[in-house]
Amino acid sequence: MDELKEIKLKNYQYLNEVAIKGETLFTGSSLMELFPICEIARSRGVDGIIYNRGISGLNTDEFLQHIHPLLLDLQPSKVFINIGTNDMTEEPYGDQWFQHLTANIRRILEQTQAVLPHTKIYLMAFYPANLHLPWQTPVSIQWMKLRTPENLDRCNQALEEIAQTHGCHFINCNDGLVNDRKEQKAEHTYDGVHLYANAYLKVFEALEPYLLN
């Protein structure tokens, strides 16, 4: 874990000391950290407390290593998890990246249920990516080359099956995000992966019923 991640993790540890237990938690990687969930929810009339414990660049190994400050310590009544896209890489996993990712997702759910048996767990589908934006560079394309519609669909099918097997909820918020090639719409993203707030507003519309339930 690099220095910036360590700093964010330490801040979360301090915040967890004063956090109210039993509230709603959003946690995961950058796609969760960058989700302005608290502002959007409040502007839509949601009054409950929502915590965000996302950390940019986090993979599932790191999440498991630090699952207490990122999830368990808050003892949430509901947790929305979006983690795993940073495992979609040939380094260090090679052609075993998919098996590694799905095995760790299972571990995350199992560890959460073992410690927090009454917490409602919502596993979120990976968002679409776009590898065909005109401003992308060879470096950025190489970084995200495995995030094809086919690979993302494969991951999301696996996430849904894992959630069902473990008695959790699976949420796919992607209907309003994709173009006719099943890629992220260009107006939603600045690098092909990370989202502008206009995309997160659509994500919120899809998950709001689960947030209010």
Residue positions per predicted region:
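Substrate-gating cap/lid alpha-helix
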Residues: 131-172
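Short glycine/proline- and charge-enriched loop/turn segments
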Residues: 45-49, 135-145, 183-190
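Alpha-helix N-cap and loop-to-helix initiation/capping positions
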Residues: 96-101, 140-151, 191, 195
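A short helix->loop->beta-strand "cap" motif at the edges of active sites that frequently abuts
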Residues: 116-120
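Short acidic/His/Gly/Ser-rich catalytic and metal-binding motifs that mark active-site loops
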Residues: 88-90, 130-135, 178-184
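Generic structural signal for well-ordered alpha-helices
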Residues: 105-110, 156
